[in-house]
């Protein structure tokens, strides 16, 4: 009912074209069965390295323990990006509300899709990495799962300039989309989802599976919660997006920052998996206590995100502080009954896990092995 009210009369001719489920979508339940999802940022030229090739994925796919035995590592991967620097026209664009640059339009959304589906990177490279690991260990019980980011349909061409145009995104079926209309924002999101589905279907992957989508904003601002609702109107498109991806048997995932606007009501808006960020890794003031975090996620039935970056490597200043905080995540998850009961996601900066896996420093090796053992022995995985 809500989606129908929001959509109104919009892009009807386009909507009528898109009710077909692909065969692999028909066979699937929308309930996501994966336990440990690692975040992979990519698509913008400022990322170093830029490409996600099979060598970069390899440590995330398989882990060799200290006895020389190989194990499957992360069972799911979130491909995401929030900004575009060095794109086709050289300008800077934002995929999420609140970031610097022009709001990304249809061309930039297409660039993001192109990046993840390019030959030798993204989906293709992950498929290769899993195939090669399968040659050594045999096929895993299930395909590795992929969740792909969804850009914000940002209201204004410059997100905080209400004098800038709302008709900047591009056309659908020959009609210019105007993001002052909720239905046009939803139509753009549906176009994006359909383009991703079409591109994935054409690839015929055997070792990976596209299972969900992820709105890039870390807060869901509504009239009664959050800042600058007049610039965001998040509630106009989240529930319709959830309804749309569910129609094709995908899950909708979200990772809000600690106590972000919308975290209490996310499940009622249609999200299937909500991993809240503790933000403890960067907490210099002590105002994001882990005890409060665990109470929050239990009360609101949320999953947990782990957080680390390259800063925990021994070569970096204050690495001991960051290592200690990361151990707090593992110890806290076990202490509070999250480990083995709730799904987990892992923020690792741009390349943190890869660099940790390649380090020869004894402290780094210990952390790497402790963390990998934590992931591969997740009791929840054994039930899937």
Regions picked out by a protein language model, each given a short descriptive name:
Residues 13-15:
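Boundary at the C-terminal end of the N-terminal hydrophobic targeting segment
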Residues 1-8:
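Bacterial N-terminal signal peptides
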Residues 50-63, 99-134, 171-200, 228-243, ...:
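Well-ordered, non-membrane alpha-helical segments in soluble/globular domains
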């Amino acid at each position: 009912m809500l989606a129908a009210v929001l959509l109104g009369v919009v892009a009807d001719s386009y909507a009528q074209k898109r009710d077909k489920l692909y065969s692999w979508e028909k066979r699937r339940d929308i309930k996501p069965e994966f336990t440990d999802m690692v975040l992979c940022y990519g698509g913008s030229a400022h990322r170093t390295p830029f490409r996600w090739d099979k060598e970069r994925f390899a440590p995330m796919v398989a882990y060799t323990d200290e006895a020389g035995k190989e194990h499957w590592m992360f069972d799911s991967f979130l491909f995401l990006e929030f900004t575009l620097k060095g794109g086709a026209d050289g300008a800077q664009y934002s995929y999420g509300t609140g970031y610097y640059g022009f709001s990304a339009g249809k061309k930039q959304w297409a660039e993001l899709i192109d990046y993840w589906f390019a030959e030798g990177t993204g989906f293709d490279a992950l498929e290769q990495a899993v195939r090669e690991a399968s040659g050594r260990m045999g096929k895993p019980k299930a395909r590795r799962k992929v969740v792909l980011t969804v850009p914000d349909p940002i209201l204004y061409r410059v997100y905080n300039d209400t004098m800038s145009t709302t008709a900047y995104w591009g056309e659908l079926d020959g009609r210019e989309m105007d993001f002052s209309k909720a239905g046009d924002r939803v139509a753009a999101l549906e176009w994006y989802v359909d383009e991703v589905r079409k591109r994935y279907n054409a690839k015929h992957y055997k070792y990976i599976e596209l299972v969900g989508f992820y709105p890039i904003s870390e807060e869901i601002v509504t009239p009664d919660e959050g800042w600058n609702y007049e610039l965001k109107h998040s509630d106009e498109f989240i529930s319709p997006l959830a309804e749309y991806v569910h129609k094709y048997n995908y899950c909708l995932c979200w990772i809000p920052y600690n106590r972000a606007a919308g975290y209490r009501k996310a499940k009622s808006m249609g999200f299937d998996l909500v991993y809240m960020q503790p933000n403890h890794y960067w907490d210099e003031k002590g105002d994001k206590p882990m005890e409060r975090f665990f109470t929050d996620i239990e009360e609101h039935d949320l999953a947990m995100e782990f957080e680390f970056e390259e800063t925990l490597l021994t070569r970096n200043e204050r690495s001991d502080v960051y290592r200690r905080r990361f151990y707090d995540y593992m110890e806290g998850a076990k202490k509070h009954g999250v480990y083995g009961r709730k799904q987990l996601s892992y923020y690792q900066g741009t390349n943190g896990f890869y660099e940790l896996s390649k380090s020869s420093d004894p402290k780094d090796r210990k952390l790497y092995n402790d963390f990998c053992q934590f992931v591969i022995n997740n009791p929840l995985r054994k039930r899937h």
